[in-house]
Regions:
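Surface-exposed substrate-engagement region within the catalytic domains
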Residues: 217-335
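Bacterial N-terminal signal peptides that target proteins for export
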Residues: 2-11
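Bacterial signal peptide processing site
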Residues: 25-27
């Protein structure tokens, strides 16, 4: 950690697109007469499969946009009808967050208490529990390919999924790319993201490709084009697997962590949360939220609370649910504890 660190109708649409493609491919082959009068069969025109797929995706996206305009969201969307409260970390690490720092049973008891506090603080909005697991983690060592990141083992991922299912919680898989990039890392999670209860987080702090530095030495950055890649990646999974919308979380605690935010292109198949990720005293945290989230809105907002770092110096304290609900505008729909 850097010391300054203070997402039915779509299925029908897909079938329509597939049917149109099938009809085109099954048309009789045209023929023409040769100079001798015999028929010469023309070879079938080559099909640009990538173009066809893009057209189908565009058709599906337009259908999604139409539904969203009429109803405000797609069927099965979690936001804004819930407040997500998450425990963050890695079950194999005591140093990455509350998820993994304490024995499982002890952590789950604490989680139940936190969930109850949030539900009591705002009875009007149901609380959705979540585990937010760092699944691809930035590393201090380069690794075999020099990219400074490591993916959790399958057994770790499956155990984390099991923990989430025990709590009827959704699961976020968080990605720290190091010197790699999203196009190389996100496809590794495709099979997991086909699960409707699994969502995605991306962390610009550890995106170092444009910084030419090892993770932890500088604060990394993403541009709108990187966020758009993640949105499109998730939207494709939603469409191809007939899923409810996915949630994408983008962490942020400095101006430079996200550039050109106005160029982010929202898609109704993906619900985007900008998560204010800094630690420190409540005044600093609220100021950072105002500067980097409230003043640069994208869609939905999130706020992180640190069990250790927010109380590091007296009289600092861990903000209560009531404080978060009454002192932040817009009120976060995602609250994360690390």
């Amino acid at each position: 950690m850097v010391s300054s660190k203070v997402f039915g109708p779509l299925a029908a649409c897909a079938l329509l697109a597939a049917g149109a493609l099938s009809a085109c491919q099954n048309r009789p082959i045209e023929s023409e007469k040769s100079a001798t009068g015999s028929s010469v069969v023309k070879p079938p025109a080559a099909i640009d499969t990538l173009k066809v797929k893009r057209l189908a995706m565009q058709h599906d996206s337009l259908k999604a946009d139409s539904i969203a305009r009429k109803t405000g969201q797609l069927p099965g969307a979690l936001l804004p009808g819930h407040r997500i409260v998450a425990f963050y970390g890695n079950i194999r690490s005591k140093g990455m967050g509350i998820l993994g720092r304490e024995p499982k049973a002890q952590m789950m008891r604490k989680f139940d208490k936190v969930l109850a506090e949030w539900q009591a603080a705002d009875p009007s909005l149901p609380v959705m529990p979540a585990l937010h697991s760092v699944t691809i983690t930035a590393q201090g060592a380069a690794g075999a390919d020099g990219k400074y990141r490591l993916m959790n083992s399958k057994s770790t991922i499956e155990e984390t999924r099991a923990w989430a299912k025990e709590k009827n919680a959704i699961l976020f898989m968080d990605v720290q790319v190091g010197l790699s990039d999203l196009p190389h890392e996100l496809p590794k999670l495709t099979e997991y993201l086909k699960d409707p209860t699994i969502h995605l987080g991306i962390d610009p702090e550890f995106a170092m490709a444009t910084k030419n530095a090892r993770p932890g030495k500088k604060i990394g950055t993403y541009d709108a084009k990187d966020v758009n890649y993640a949105i499109n990646f998730l939207a494709r999974i939603v469409s191809e697997n007939h899923l409810p919308p996915k949630i994408l979380i983008v962490h942020r605690f400095t101006q430079g962590m996200l550039t050109n935010y106005k160029n982010i292109k929202l898609d109704p198949r993906v619900q985007l949360i900008m998560d204010m990720d800094g630690w420190g005293d409540p005044v600093l945290k609220k100021d950072s939220y105002k500067a980097y989230v409230q003043k640069q809105p994208v869609q939905y907002t999130g706020f992180k609370l640190f069990y250790e770092y927010d109380i590091k110096r007296k009289p600092f304290h861990l903000m209560t649910p009531k404080e978060v609900l009454t002192e932040l505008t817009p009120v976060p729909l995602y609250v994360q504890y690390q």
